[in-house]
Amino acid sequence: MKKTPSASDSGSSSAGGGGRPRPRVEDAVSAGGVVYRLNEGIEIAICGRTSDGVWGLPKGTPDPGETIEQTAVREVSEETGLQVEIVAKIGVVEYWFAREGVRYHKWVHHFLMQTTGGDTSQHDLEYDKVEWRPVEDALRTLTFRNEANMVEKAREMIEAMT
């Protein structure tokens, strides 16, 4: 992650003289995808974690030397157990979050992907389950609105191709 200079980097102990130090800010990038298949309609692979009730799209951070596309394919394959290939780029979600005193400015690159093999029972342990859901059900189930927006865009792209 690339570090953005903060007040502590410049020797100042507070932001704007308010007496409170500014949190460190770091940039973060990840990549993943909306994996689809055509069954009796469009189905989307989503990942669930029972410990916190989160349902999301598969994604993760780049390994050294990886392109964003390589990261997306690797992370989606690991988290879903599926072999996938990229069809098209859907878009980028940008957001901020804080963890352990650090503010992160994150960009998540999402790709439309189709499955070429594999089995969801072979997913890694980041999520408890991976399920194929009809697109409408996936939209209702996903925890984060920004991921549902990516699924909406993916559906439009799939419908334009079929």
What are these language model-derived features?
Residues 56-59:
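A short gly/proline-enriched turn/hairpin at secondary-structure junctions
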Residues 39-43, 100-103:
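Short, solvent-exposed loop/turn segments that connect beta-strands within catalytic domains
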